[in-house]
Amino acid sequence: LIRGLQTSDDTHAKAEAFAKKVGKVAITARNSPGFAVNRILCPMINEAIFALQEGIATAEDLDAGMKLGCNHPIGPLALADMIGLDTMLSVMEVFYEGFNDPKYRPAPLLKEMVAAGHLGRKTGQGFYSYGK
């Protein structure tokens, strides 16, 4: 739930109750670029792209390392392909411009892949090939 400056406690409680009623678990965050989850997730994925670009490891090994070492159900590069590399680039650009912080600079490889039309699963090619 995104809680604005003028969101009353009553409104917040009603939204939380509705989420619970429809079987969801709500978290509350203030209104900020990327909110809570994407603010953590997207820079992690971007860093995996930097690691791939720098030749630290293959896409397969980076993903396997995060699955095994961090107990993630999917690796960051496979997840980027699922999200869409164009979407990932857009999010990172919003962060970079919104926070004016170099830690949010999109990886050059991400920009190159988007420019080449390699957007992930939706185009059949991203960090992995999907046979479309």
Language model segments and positions:
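N-terminal alpha-helical segment
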Residues: 44-45
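NAD(P)-dependent Rossmann-like dehydrogenase/reductase catalytic/cofactor-binding core
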Residues: 3-31, 35, 49-54, 58-132
